[in-house]
Amino acid sequence: DLAFWIHTDSLEPKYEKGAVVLIKQTYYDQAGAIYAIDFDGQTLIKRVFREANGIRLVSLNKKYSDQIIPLDEEPGVIGKVIDGFVPLNLEEIK
């Protein structure tokens, strides 16, 4: 299993920029779940829906538009997001 840093605000309000999400390596098995997708050399973490012409990636933050990736462009499922957290800033604790 894997962990990824979130570098944008596209998953807010659930996961803020700077959070870490935990990924269970699996295949696509649940419409609307949040997945890590490998596409064109990038890892995209979005809510995923299977469409007739591809997969639809949906940000949780409504300011972003949906993205359709055609299946012939071979997007790959890395795994499903199972949890997330914001790491502690140890300097703030001292």
Write out the residue ranges for each language-model feature.
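Acidic/glycine-rich C-terminal interaction modules and beta/coil loop segments
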Residues: 1-94
